[in-house]
From Swiss-Prot:
Cellular component aspect of the GO annotation: cytosol
SMART domains, alphabetized: CRS1_YhbY
InterPro entries associated with the record: RNA-binding_CRM (IPR001890), RNA-binding_domain (IPR051925), RNA-binding_YhbY (IPR017924), YhbY-like_sf (IPR035920)
Protein's name in the database: RNA-binding protein YhbY
NCBIfam families: PRK10343.1 (NF007669), RNA_bind_YhbY (TIGR00253)
Amino acid sequence: MNLSTKQKQHLKGLAHPLKPVVLLGSNGLTEGVLAEIEQALEHHELIKVKIATEDRETKTLIVEAIVRETGACNVQVIGKTLVLYRPTKERKISLPR
């Protein structure tokens, strides 16, 4: 799913007050963490994930893996925080055209 710039801006505004729902620890990306992200996306549609790593390359690889495995859209990455969006069947968030 590709998001337009206008849609990404809308989602960034909605995500601003949110707290990270999933925190990645020193173990990195595990099956349990992926399951937690899946469950959070199913429940909320728009979530923040906190990635605890200092290395940019590692963080980029983790972000790409999360997006690939969950099928979610990468809305934004700021510092160690990733914002993900994946619509559910009943669409809780309406996107602008």
